[in-house]
Amino acid sequence: MTIFNSISSISNPTRSTSSSIATLNYTGSVFNDNSTACFDNDLGRWGGCGGCGGSNVNIINLDIDIGRRRHRRCC
């Protein structure tokens, strides 16, 4: 459910991208082909393992990949 809320928030021009990231409550790291990002448990604040990929496309890919690759660690 969080994935769909995040994607709809990103695609809605009246809401900011940061508000959609803040809906994530995930501890661990996420890897995909475009970028690396780490989440702590503080309402979606970025960790120190690469930061944000810099585009909405990367953020959507990270949301989708959370369910498949949650066991890998970067920190």
UniProtKB/Swiss-Prot annotation:
InterPro entries: HssA/B-related
Similarity comment text for this entry: Belongs to the UPF0512 family.
Naturally occurring in which organism (per UniProt): Dictyostelium discoideum (Social amoeba)
Protein name (record): UPF0512 protein C
Superkingdom field: Eukaryota
Pfam families: Coiled (PF05710)
Organism lineage string: Eukaryota, Amoebozoa, Evosea, Eumycetozoa, Dictyostelia
